[in-house]
Amino acid sequence: MTWLELQNNIRDLGFDDENPATMISSANRAINLIKKTLVEANKEYFRMIYEDEEWEPVSPTQITEETEDEFKIQIPDKLIDLVPLLAAHYAWLDDDIQKATMYWNEYDDLKNQLVADMVRPQNAEFWGGLGW
């Protein structure tokens, strides 16, 4: 997801462009929280799916007013759909607590589904054992 796509997603969730600083701040808060709570906590899972024992989460680059629209959000693809929901939660937090709560609930539901999928045992083969 690019910065432009994220902005469009946040707009689709009802937030307008009147205050770009709020959109930028909300996006940065969402990206940082997802990195700290989901990406780092599930490093082994991402190492496995990327088949890279050296995989480490990158520290996300902070979005600013100068950030190019084509800038790719630095969150693993599996978790990227969480970013607009959490950013919308933060964007609405001061103005409309009901909307903020609704987006938090949607974020939390999707997050729980993704976490359950990440901790579900992957395909495994068992070899050996005791013969009769």
Q: Locations of the language-model features?
A:
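Short, surface-exposed beta-strand/strand-loop-strand elements in extracellular ectodomains
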Residues: 103-106
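Conserved short "hinge" loops at termini or chain/domain junctions
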Residues: 1-72, 113-132
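Short, hydrophobic/amphipathic alpha-helical patches that form generic packing surfaces
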Residues: 81-94
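Charged, low-complexity interaction regions
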Residues: 95-101
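Structural motif
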Residues: 72-82
